[in-house]
């Protein structure tokens, strides 16, 4: 037990720049590469499928992070929370930004391909929400994850900082989940043409 706590404080458990990059870079690059290949192929069906899959992954991740992990973390000590943060880093730092940006990018190409009126009130609301999600993700969520990552690489000396930033990002995931559900409602309208 004491050895486990010592490892957490010293950034033990095999967490290094190389190991985290080895796990994280594929998560970052694969969705981007797949989207680029689909766009070059010009296959609308694949683009639609990709958008649904990565969008579902993004919403699912926010559901897990914003609800389940936030609930679980409340019952843990700060040292245990920091250990959980360390294990989440490859996914939160690399995968989340990748699926978020590729989902939005694919959605823009889909909207253009479907001939959606960019000046309709529904599209404007959807675009504003997507912009909010992008700003939250790239200007708040990602910098926080980089701070957590940097702190863990330095040996997790400031456990309170790691925990504070992680808990903030979990709350941010919950707010993103709510916004994504609103977007899904509008997406159903675009796909079916039904009235809201």
Regions found by a protein language model. Give the residues of each.
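Polytopic transmembrane helical bundles with strong interfacial aromatic enrichment
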Residues: 1-196
